[in-house]
Amino acid sequence: MATEGAAQLGNRVAGMVCSLWVLLLVSSVLALEEVLLDTTGETSEIGWLTYPPGGWDEVSVLDDQRRLTRTFEACHVAGAPPGTGQDNWLQTHFVERRGAQRAHIRLHFSVRACSSLGVSGGTCRETFTLYYRQAEEPDSPDSVSSWHLKRWTKVDTIAADESFPSSSSSSSSSSSAAWAVGPHGAGQRAGLQLNVKERSFGPLTQRGFYVAFQDTGACLALVAVRLFSYTCPAVLRSFASFPETQASGAGGASLVAAVGTCVAHAEPEEDGVGGQAGGSPPRLHCNGEGKWMVAVGGCRCQPGYQPARGDKACQACPRGLYKSSAGNAPCSPCPARSHAPNPAAPVCPCLEGFYRASSDPPEAPCTGPPSAPQELWFEVQGSALMLHWRLPRELGGRGDLLFNVVCKECEGRQEPASGGGGTCHRCRDEVHFDPRQRGLTESRVLVGGLRAHVPYILEVQAVNGVSELSPDPPQAAAINVSTSHEVPSAVPVVHQVSRASNSITVSWPQPDQTNGNILDYQLRYYDQAEDESHSFTLTSETNTATVTQLSPGHIYGFQVRARTAAGHGPYGGKVYFQTLPQGELSSQLPERLSLVIGSILGALAFLLLAAITVLAVVFQRKRRGTGYTEQLQQYSSPGLGVKYYIDPSTYEDPCQAIRELAREVDPAYIKIEEVIGTGSFGEVRQGRLQPRGRREQTVAIQALWAGGAESLQMTFLGRAAVLGQFQHPNILRLEGVVTKSRPLMVLTEFMELGPLDSFLRQREGQFSSLQLVAMQRGVAAAMQYLSSFAFVHRSLSAHSVLVNSHLVCKVARLGHSPQGPSCLLRWAAPEVIAHGKHTTSSDVWSFGILMWEVMSYGERPYWDMSEQEVLNAIEQEFRLPPPPGCPPGLHLLMLDTWQKDRARRPHFDQLVAAFDKMIRKPDTLQAGGDPGERPSQALLTPVALDFPCLDSPQAWLSAIGLECYQDNFSKFGLCTFSDVAQLSLEDLPALGITLAGHQKKLLHHIQLLQQHLRQQGSVEV
């Protein structure tokens, strides 16, 4: 029993403690009541004013708790003459509002039921009315009291929830009889039975107020009146303290903002605008009932401090811990190779010998410089050498390893470690490094321009992001080198002699400078479908060689170098030849046999006979027709060998063409991700390609799903076969195809920024003229490369050019033939429109339109003109005007590409040279040339705005595509067209228009606006 009693006692104690905590918790958030007037428990005379005298009686009664209290009573129902109404007023003393904006009143009262009073005639009430009146000063004693209703503002009519029967069986005309205070026998209920009502009124604006109660025929007793205002209590939350705040005077739905103060070592949270630290102070809102709500913002602990006691305080990080940014996260241990010797550390300093780069975040570990590179060696290549080395043993804990090469020229043989001892000096300017001398990412460099038989010391330094912070010089390794010019020069060209399905015979002339007796030649070859590092070599003592064991229908690259007693010379340029498809007979090119070593008379006779035979065959073929009558189209260039472009449409089976011209990819290596656009054959998706043993790369994937027509499949694969034949830094690269399973897929490199036209429209005015020239130069270089294969693009436009994250422009949509002459009419040359004849010259015309698109930031060529209007303008030899801000030199180049006579248009190599000159000498962009040397061409005017339909500068800005400045115009009061027409270039920065492209565009349209207003005679400009 004792144990049970103890347990019960413990439970009661625990319950009391829990209740106490709940009470404390609730009291911390409950509203505060500031009392303005309270008659509860009053036992002495209150002395409020009544009208008429005797209408209300102040008496002492027992309340519902049997406590004696002063009350005001009115009960004149039974004694009133029949047909007369009651109008009894009771007014409080003057009540100071003490800063309250709204007052609340809580009434304790009792009402007798009319049915218990025996009163008839409708003069009995069970309600009374509550009023209030504001005043700056209390009423003077001698002032005439006026109870006129106009002086009072009604609060509400108060009705009892319960009315009670009379305490005696008979009614009385006196209130004292109705509310008699007398002895009560045992068991009899004493005191009054009460109703409690609460009302509020406001807003209060004067010094104080009176409250009045109007009785119109009730039998009631006012037991207690409590006037008070609500106040939100002082509170601490979100690391901010908020002061005690008066509730709003407009009622429960209105809010009063309170500004908080951050606790020690805390700061306001960011506003979310621009990510700036140190936002606005936090705010909490007090409603009309004295309750906090709607928190805006807050505070957070400063760097080096973490939350404590929930969200009430910020304490310093202990030693060994740190916090780098403001926020409410806890402190963290110091990163590797760093420490925090003092409390409140925002960052951990690095240990001696270790550093943190300026770009490293505070949470990054401290790192050190790398050790020296290892195992330097070199290969002599004529007057140049290829220097190799291995990675340092220690990388310092970083991944941004770079290499610098230091070159020293010495007078005699030097040891690398000696540093020259004063006999070595920096290499001459003629020595050059490929790709560069400093900041190398690969462990090799080609050093050229070295003098023969001169000793050099090449030193390779290993550096990373913290090397500059170290007081010690970078760790380096050095090697002695020497070169000789006695090796032969490069073999200038390689020719194909014959080919079969599994072999190719090639020949070549001697180097221009043999520099001694040629001992032999080394031929290097590789399959174009494979990586160049997987090449093979063979040695020939003559200037001809046959390569066997090749794959049918594959394209191979060839290079040759000669060897003398001094060593190998450099390789010559690469040329590409293709083996015959399986089953075709060996192809001989006798006209090339003149290059085969041998001069006997029988060979000469054979050459003569073969030449006559070839001429006859060529003559017959020309008579039968021209065009793409062979699978293999060739273009000869002196000194460059033979270039081939294979038309896949000549294959009966498109899959055979794609297998010969592109690399097949296993679908298991492909991961398809989200949709990034729409192509000619459906959705284009981003994906990942990771062949076995190779690095993963992002690709664009276009798939042709099952059910497509055979002609659609041929077109789909044919375009990939065309793209796979070209390798150029400004042409979209084909990564592979999937033809052995479904769906068919074509994989190309991923171009992050999409088509050039939409890219420019999204970044209008953000590039300099030279940057735009560089973009055009890249496209022109790609077209020069394509034209060297006699390949015609047919649909060149800014939309057919893609842009990657490095702003490199790459030509795409190869093999996408326009569907009819009206397609892409805005980019088509006159001969294409008239006869459907596509040539490289027509591509030059289209390139000129592309130039105009670039300089206008993706503007639609010929604006909103209809296709018939465009056709008429071209036939009448009208040409596009320069876009706003376009340098004259660039527009003249556009006009050259739009020559009606296609023979007078420049070639792409001339365009590339012109762009190179502009980049080297930017002043040539502004050169207009001699007008007399150029044909006079009429220029189109942009489609004029319909000014009568534009009712404001805001609408005008929208019409010209600059609606982003509408708020700027409104802010500076530019409300009429006359105001806008007065603007000049100097005014635009003040309006917030700082982009050069936007300034030029706006000034151009202001000139058009001025012309319109001159015609209307409404403004002087």
Curated annotation (Swiss-Prot):
Domain Protein kinase: 670-919
Domain Fibronectin type-III: 369-486, 487-582
Record's GO cellular component terms: cytosol; dendrite; extracellular region; plasma membrane
Post-translational modification comment from the UniProt entry: Ligand-binding increases phosphorylation on tyrosine residues. Phosphorylation on tyrosine residues is mediated by transphosphorylation by the catalytically active EPHB1 in a ligand-independent manner. Tyrosine phosphorylation of the receptor may act as a switch on the functional transition from cell adhesion/attraction to de-adhesion/repulsion.
Tissue spec. comment: Expressed in brain. Expressed in non invasive breast carcinoma cell lines (at protein level). Strong expression in brain and pancreas, and weak expression in other tissues, such as heart, placenta, lung, liver, skeletal muscle and kidney. Expressed in breast non invasive tumors but not in metastatic lesions. Isoform 3 is expressed in cell lines of glioblastomas, anaplastic astrocytomas, gliosarcomas and astrocytomas. Isoform 3 is not detected in normal tissues.
Leader sequence segment: 1-31
Extracellular side of membrane: 32-594
Biased composition (Low complexity): 166-176
Region of interest: Disordered: 163-182
Gene3D superfamilies named in the record: ephrin a2 ectodomain, Galactose-binding domain-like, Immunoglobulins, Phosphorylase Kinase, domain 1, Transcription Factor, Ets-1, Transferase(Phosphotransferase) domain 1, Tumor Necrosis Factor Receptor, subunit A, domain 2
Protein name: Ephrin type-B receptor 6
Organism taxonomic ancestry: Eukaryota, Metazoa, Chordata, Craniata, Vertebrata
